[in-house]
A protein has these predicted regions:
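N-terminal segments that cap or nucleate solenoid repeat domains
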Residues: 1-49, 53, 58-61, 68-69, ...
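Conserved hydrophobic register position within alpha-solenoid helical repeats
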Residues: 5-8, 34-37, 65, 96, ...
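Core register positions within helices of long alpha-helical scaffolds
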Residues: 11, 40-43, 68-71, 99-102, ...
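Amphipathic alpha-helical scaffolding segments comprising HEAT/armadillo-like alpha-solenoid repeats
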Residues: 14-26, 44-55, 74-86, 105-117, ...
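Short inter-helical turns and helix N-cap capping residues of alpha-solenoid HEAT/ARM repeat scaffolds
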Residues: 29-30, 57-58, 88-89, 119-120, ...
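A generic tandem-repeat structural signature
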Residues: 52, 57-72, 78-103, 109-114, ...
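TPR/Sel1-like alpha-solenoid repeat signature
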Residues: 69, 84, 93, 100, ...
């Protein structure tokens, strides 16, 4: 088979040709093909052959074999994976540690703990993550040591692992880690104290709601909801006005968890918007325009931005004209948002939108062009100028 050109791994897998795939894995010089054969054998359930690939000459194949064994959770792989912790390549050692965590056998804890002495921080981080998956409280002291002494990646993974283990005795070192110089560590520690649900974390988490890093602020907001203390209500309401929408969303979810009832004001509007309940927000009237504009311009969800645009069109407030026009004529804005902006401008019906809509008749997307034409027709009819849109687009 291999003498007559490049082997077709997909075809071999379709035929369930284990012999052919084994030949590719053992004899083909191309690492990419050996890796493909490895994955095919994994899908076919030939895990003994996958275990054998831990001895492949290429570190990439060995690491992929370790990952595959972890994902399949075959306990026969435990000893070979423990041996792979001594591999000369750190990618393989890291993959083996992750896989042992996925197997879930606490017997692997001792060899994993020994790897905290590994010279590579990625391996030590993988060990911490694996120990968190195993969830054995015996790992707590070594993890606390890594939290206090390791580099940033190891500190972060140690914090997350302590949260997964869930022993409240770890609360003090985790609280200290909330003040870590590194944002990733602060975020991981905030997630961990949320898992522990200890009221001691309330004040430090409230402080993190003003952290310069938005990921830290978002995680603090989420963890405050998990801890479940009413002292967090006021600060979480303030967090609804955060300039980053991921923070707003987490604050809204935590407020819902704490049973907060929104009022008919801008914070209430932001609450509904963050939970993607735009219809409820629109019912509030004029106070919703500013937060809707924020969603239109900043949200990371294209569908959410489009929904905000349509809601602004439904409200019909002229304050939305500038932001809607900016979205319509910006080719970097997703097509679905540009279409919704055109639709909203047509619904508002202000003559200041005529020129931007005519410009949109030249948009590279046909659906945007069609929506712009419909919006122009809508405005022109409203102004008593029927047919003007067609003429403007026929130049």
């Amino acid at each position: 088979m291999l003498r007559f050109g490049r082997p077709n791994v997909e075809k071999l897998e379709g035929k369930r040709d284990v012999v052919g795939l084994t030949r590719v894995l053992s004899s083909t010089p191309q690492v990419e093909l050996r890796t493909q054969a490895l994955h095919a054998l994994t899908r076919l359930g030939e895990l003994d052959l996958v275990i054998g690939a831990l001895g492949d000459g290429a570190a990439e194949v060995r690491a992929e074999a370790a990952r595959a064994l972890g994902e399949n959770r075959d306990m026969q792989a435990e000893l070979p994976l423990v041996l792979a912790l001594r591999d000369h390549d750190w990618h393989v050692r890291s993959a083996a540690a992750e896989a042992l965590g996925r197997l879930g056998d606490t017997e692997a804890e001792e060899p994993l703990l020994a790897e905290f002495g590994d010279s590579n921080s990625h391996v030590r981080a993988a060990v911490a993550e694996a120990l968190g998956r195993l969830g054995d409280a015996r790992a707590e002291v070594p993890l606390v040591r890594q939290l206090c002494e390791g580099d940033r990646l190891v500190r972060a993974k140690a914090a997350e692992a302590l949260g997964q283990i869930g022993d409240r005795q770890a609360i003090e070192p985790l609280l200290a880690a909330l003040s870590d110089e590194d944002a990733y560590v602060r975020e991981s520690a905030a997630r961990a104290v949320g898992c522990l649900r200890d009221a001691k974390a309330i004040d430090p988490l409230l402080t993190l709601l003003t952290d310069p890093d938005s990921s830290v602020r978002a995680q603090a907001a989420e963890s405050l909801g998990k801890v479940g203390d009413a002292r967090a209500l006021g600060p979480l309401v303030e967090a609804l006005g955060d300039r980053r929408y991921d923070v707003c969303r987490m604050a809204a979810r935590s407020l819902a968890r704490l049973g907060w009832r929104p009022g008919c004001n801008e914070y209430g509007a932001r609450y509904y918007l963050a939970l993607h309940m735009i219809d409820r927000a629109v019912e509030m009237g004029g106070c919703v325009v500013k937060p809707l504009v924020t969603v239109l311009l900043e949200d990371d969800s294209h569908s959410m931005r489009a929904a905000a645009a349509r809601a602004l069109g439904e409200i019909g407030d002229e304050r939305a004209l500038g932001p809607l026009i900016a979205c319509l004529n910006n080719s970097g804005v997703p097509e679905v948002v540009r279409m919704a902006a055109a639709e909203a401008l047509g619904a508002i019906g202000d003559s200041s939108a005529l020129r931007p809509l005519r410009t949109a008749l030249l948009d590279h997307d046909p659906e945007v062009r069609d929506t712009a034409k419909q919006a122009l027709d809508q405005i022109n009819v409203r102004l008593g100028w029927p047919g003007a849109a067609v003429k403007s687009g026929s130049r």
